[in-house]
UniProtKB/Swiss-Prot annotation:
GO molecular function: rRNA binding; structural constituent of ribosome
InterPro entries: Ribosomal_uS4, Ribosomal_uS4_bac-type, Ribosomal_uS4_CS, Ribosomal_uS4_N, S4_RNA-bd, S4_RNA-bd_sf
Gene: rpsD
Pfam families documented for this protein: Ribosomal_S4, S4
UniProt protein name: Small ribosomal subunit protein uS4
Domain S4 RNA-binding: residue ranges: 96-156
Family designation: Belongs to the universal ribosomal protein uS4 family.
Free-text function comment from the UniProt entry: One of the primary rRNA binding proteins, it binds directly to 16S rRNA where it nucleates assembly of the body of the 30S subunit.
Biological processes, Gene Ontology terms: ribosomal small subunit biogenesis; translation
Source organism (scientific name): Shewanella baltica (strain OS155 / ATCC BAA-1091)
Disulfide bonds: none
Amino acid sequence: MARYLGPKLKLSRREGTDLFLKSGVRAIDSKCKLETAPGQHGARKPRLSEYGTQLREKQKVRRIYGVLEKQFRNYYKDAARTKGNTGENLLQLLETRLDNVVYRMGFGATRAESRQLVSHKSIMVNGRVVNIPSFKVSANDVVSIREKSRTQARIKAALEVAAQREKPTWVEVDNAKMEGAFKRVPERSDLSAEINEQLIVELYSK
């Protein structure tokens, strides 16, 4: 399955919520009708079945983190094999992706931009260049911008935007040094309450 390259707002309208796919401090502009699906007949919101509701939640989370279907299913399998709550394990695995950590630290304005920074070898983990977006970041790892990439306008712009919003408690960032520490894996209570991971567990358990 190819990665979606079309309008980002269309995906947010499809899921009926802001997926934070666009950069900026504020949420999506009020002109974007999130309660209405895209397309000519978007106003006619169909009544979803139980399966449809579960599928929409899975698609929403997959799009938030920018993960393809096969990758997402593999994350679920790993989460199911891990001791503890499968849904919480799934979200924690997604949160430890390097592209997501780069986004959480404010080095990229969006997860898509953060993924690009990783792929283009602009990111280092513990002093070594890592260009794999799905690389798993561990507690106490130090993530930094590579020296030769620190003058990039988009990184500076992202840091300015990030400075205006509250940083997650599980990362510690030094904007001057352009580096941050991943202090711990976030708990479920740290993450968005708008995600219902249990629906995803129910979907994949069938």
